[in-house]
């Protein structure tokens, strides 16, 4: 673990962080679209449980 810094000699840190940001954004967008396209509705379920 002490020589882990050498990974940045192989990979350019800017490209790694940009790629990580793009990946996380696309993953979040995909998760949101999957949840929105499902029949799951937390508001109606909470109202049914709460009796409102």
Swiss-Prot record:
It comes from the Bacteria. GO terms for molecular function: bacteriochlorophyll binding; electron transporter, transferring electrons within the cyclic electron transport pathway of photosynthesis activity; metal ion binding. It is found in: Cell inner membrane. A bacteriochlorophyll binds at residue 32. The core complex is formed by different alpha and beta chains, binding bacteriochlorophyll molecules, and arranged most probably in tetrameric structures disposed around the reaction center. The non-pigmented gamma chains may constitute additional components. NCBIfam families: pufA_517_ASD (NF040861). GO terms for cellular component: organelle inner membrane; plasma membrane; plasma membrane light-harvesting complex. This is Light-harvesting protein B-870 alpha chain. Residues 37-52 are periplasmic. Residues 1-15 are cytoplasmic. Pfam families: LHC (PF00556). Its main location: membrane. It comes from Roseobacter denitrificans (strain ATCC 33942 / OCh 114). GO terms for biological process: photosynthesis, light reaction. Antenna complexes are light-harvesting systems, which transfer the excitation energy to the reaction centers.
């Amino acid at each position: 673990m002490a020589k882990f810094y050498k990974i940045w000699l192989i990979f350019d840190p800017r490209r790694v962080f940009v790629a990580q940001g793009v990946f996380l954004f696309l993953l979040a967008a995909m998760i949101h679209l999957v949840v929105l396209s499902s029949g799951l509705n937390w508001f109606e379920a909470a109202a049914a449980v709460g009796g409102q």
